[in-house]
């Protein structure tokens, strides 16, 4: 397939402007000539269209998007008459949450408002049996009134979908800064994994930092298995004890101790005066975290070796074939 350019006609969509580009696809603003509606069109790069994994991802994202109908979820329009693989979505006048976060920390009121709205959208998709599995600031759009849209359901799955294995690591795992501890351990994850990711984003909006760090993705993921995040109020004392408690509940390492639903998360954000603050001794002194250093170092070494092992296996397979 040839590349698109402004002015081209893709079936009955007139291409107007390139608005975003990733390693796999480009997103164009276009006009549907049948009804004069402005839309966004997601088109895989020509060299990627023959990739069966990409085709499956596009198919999954399109099918999930077509069945969801909520103000907080970007709508995917159904259109069975297409000459090539692409996806037609509603046009949203807004920016990525990541773009807003790059401008600086949010006020507690704004961070809570945006997070609550995202949680309302998450509650809707979870009630329809869908888990996003890649919640991050790049997958949330925000308009000038702070209304949100969830986007990119490319690695989303229905409840009961396959668990994480090394064979599907890159397709199912999510993003290291926002992945939940249970997903790091190779478990399937559920709606509470999306809640965890939203807790990370709330922490980041308020403090300007992610709660867990490392020099590579494996160390970032390992950090959340071994350590507790620095208390947000130590970074910014203007954060209320109740809001800090809400973050802690969303970031519980064990999903059973997290919010049971995104609706509960949103409710606490909307009624912070009713949130009880628990005594959390492990959070009192960030510099004196109780960790077993030999075990931690061993974990670091093992995780640092994982990329080497994977590369070696891939090289061995390539030589054999």
Enumerate the predicted regions with their spans.
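Protein kinase catalytic-loop region centered on the HRD/HxD motif
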Residues: 120-130
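Protein kinase glycine-rich loop
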Residues: 16-22, 27
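Conserved short submotifs of the Hanks-type protein kinase catalytic core
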Residues: 82-96, 100
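AlphaC helix of the eukaryotic protein kinase fold
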Residues: 45-67
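A short, aromatic-enriched beta-strand patch in the conserved N-lobe beta-sheet
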Residues: 78-79
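C-terminal lobe helix-coil module of Hanks-type protein kinase domains
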Residues: 175-277
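Activation segment of protein kinases
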Residues: 145-188
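Activation segment signature within eukaryotic-like protein kinase domains
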Residues: 114-115
